[in-house]
Regions:
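Alpha/beta enzyme core
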Residues: 2-82, 87-224, 230-238
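Extended, intrinsically disordered, low-complexity segments
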Residues: 2, 11, 227-263
Length: 263
């Protein structure tokens, strides 16, 4: 068994066991820290990675994303799942290619969403065809690639729960291994989604609700999206603004155990 197959099997086993948190590093350093802290798997963040390039979410290319995935895969022994946005193209072939390219980079999982960067949600039948193509690509690999299908309604200005559930059910029928609707805001919404499908559901962490709350509502996997990136960036900006405005260097006294984290 090679390294990638081992990671793939570990990732599948996580989804078959107790609910877990999959944090989202934005670069190799943050991936190493999260691994050292004790998390069992990692997922990329499209917004966090785009920030490292000085760009907004959605402005990284497939080539850049798979290179980033390869770097994270090499950085730790943890399984890596890749945020593949819409597959970097509107057609099913693009979704399939994104899965293949991420697998070639070392990833053992990836997500495909139903949002067109031009500003619309794909029609349901077309969105399901894209998931089916991604599923076919995943099943053609030599290891069990875990495909997550995302319904973007709730973060794209169309928070209609009934439509979101219909989409996730269609994606389940199309072969997705994990289902995900980022932007659900309440326990009742999460519970409704989880009860409507049989595959594991990923839930985006919600400030004010604990991991236990999300698991009680049915979540099997909890991710944090770009939030850890913004925690770090906000801390840097706050320290920099204190220096600019008051000549206050007090925030610079923080020390971190790099020898331990990067051992």
């Amino acid at each position: 068994m090679d390294r990638q197959e081992k990671k793939a099997l570990e990732f599948r086993a996580l989804h078959a066991g107790k609910a877990f948190v999959i944090p989202n590093p934005w670069d190799v350093g943050s991936a190493r820290v999260l691994a050292a802290i004790g998390f069992k798997a990692l997922a990329t963040t499209s917004s966090g990675f785009a920030f490292t390039l000085g760009r907004l979410d959605g402005q990284a290319t497939l080539d850049e994303v798979v290179a980033h995935a390869a770097a994270l895969d090499e950085a730790t022994d943890l399984p890596v799942s890749v945020d593949l946005e819409n597959g970097y193209g509107p057609d099913p072939k693009s979704a399939a290619l994104a899965i293949q390219r991420s697998a070639e980079a070392g990833a053992v999982g990836g997500s495909i969403e139903d949002y067109d960067p031009a500003g619309r949600i794909y029609e349901l039948h077309h969105a399901a065809e894209r998931v089916a193509a991604a599923t076919e690509a995943a099943r053609g690999l030599r290891f069990p690639f875990t495909l997550t299908a995302r319904a973007e309604n709730h973060i794209r200005g169309h928070p209609v729960l009934e439509d979101t559930i219909a989409r996730l059910k269609a994606f389940e029928d199309a072969g997705a291994d994990v289902l995900y609707a980022p932007g659900l805001r309440t326990v009742d919404e999460i519970r409704a989604v989880c009860e409507a499908v049989s595959k594991p559901v990923n839930v985006l962490a919600i400030p004010g609700l604990s991991f236990a709350d999300l698991v009680a509502a049915g979540a099997r996997r909890v991710s944090v999206g770009g939030s850890l990136t913004w925690v770090a960036v906000r801390a840097m900006a706050d320290a920099a603004e204190a220096i600019r405005d008051a000549g206050d260097f007090s925030a610079l006294g923080a020390r971190v155990p790099l020898d331990e984290w990067l051992a």
